[in-house]
Amino acid sequence: AQAAVLLDADSGRVLYGKNEETPMAMASTTKIMTCILVLENAKVEEEVSISAYAATMPKVKLYVKKGEHYTVRELLFSLMLESHNDAAAALAEDIGGKLLGETKEASEHTTEESKAALHRFAQAMNEKAVEIGCEDTWFITPNGLDATETLTLPDGSILEKEHHTTAKDLACILRYCIRESSQRDLFREITRTQEYCFTENGRSFQCHNHNAFLQMMDGAFTGKTGFTNKAGYCYVGALERDGKCMIVALLACGWPNHKTYKWSCLLYTSPSPR
């Protein structure tokens, strides 16, 4: 990994770091923030309508269709187990629209209205990152797809921002999700589930958890994988063992054809505290 951190979840202390404060793309590990924001702003039994824009998200996807309805719970399992990009967009558009004060369903949105709702959700992600204590994190997309945006500063100058975080910030976000959020129990429940099946709109779906560490490592109970061409393979996860909880975040862990790099056995092996 080009960047890594091992964090004591109880104290927030960094036990090991490698380029842990260097900003990098983080791919679908982004979705831990999307998940916790949705949990904090919606009830899992609420229904989400699908917009035409959400349905156009690239693979990996659930293949939702405009006008369909899913529960927040169903989309959250789709989001966190299978890492579906359209589920992320649908959830973000629903919450973002509510934050904008909208009353109509997302299925009635124009493309510009959908983008405005997603932008508002990204603002909420960045506000939450500041609240958590992140020092160099910027969210643009709810699914972690690589993105850049142009900001106009108060003095009129232009600033280019990329979707990014640091290994340390990413670990701090997961710490918030499992330790501090009022919805931490639901977050843990969703991210530790191995399989979730549901039927909606006349179709049946099966979601399987792609976090292999839940099976590979004793005590592993949550986490999220990620990959984009820019970010490479990424991972953030937590483990409870011997009365301690540790969080690891890894960014830029290689690119194809190196998907089988054997770094897993070292993930939660803490070196001497620094």
Residue ranges and their predicted role:
Residues A1-K168, I178-S181:
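Active-site-adjacent loops and short helices of periplasmic peptidoglycan-processing enzymes
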